[in-house]
């Protein structure tokens, strides 16, 4: 099983890349995290936010593995605890197949793409920088895995 993070945006600061890499490398080989960056569309006078999101959605869908479980990150998504994420991770491992977490661009995710997602989740009620979301998601996936393994990283 592979955990894939598909994120709109590229050319992140080095500290974002280092933070993401730190948590990604901690994952076991059978549950590795891969990042696929999607080039953001430029908004101009003739391109509305809706148009930009549609164009980005097409790129996102092209980056998704066939048959994967898509989980979209959205400010109106389900608020999970880390323990609930760990329970979900265990269930996904038992079901098999790849999991793709989708992080939208500056305007968010296209509504049609969100409708295709199996689940909408949010990391916080706060508005977060998109680069930071990558790091936080990777950390939470590592923490969820550590809970399933009784690893001392997560302390109650």
Swiss-Prot record:
GO terms for molecular function: rRNA (pseudouridine-N3-)-methyltransferase activity. It catalyses: pseudouridine(1915) in 23S rRNA + S-adenosyl-L-methionine = N(3)-methylpseudouridine(1915) in 23S rRNA + S-adenosyl-L-homocysteine + H(+). Disulfide bonds: none annotated. Its EC number is 2.1.1.177. Transmembrane segments: none annotated. It is an enzyme of class 2 (transferase). S-adenosyl-L-methionine binds at residues 73, 104, 123-128. This is Ribosomal RNA large subunit methyltransferase H.
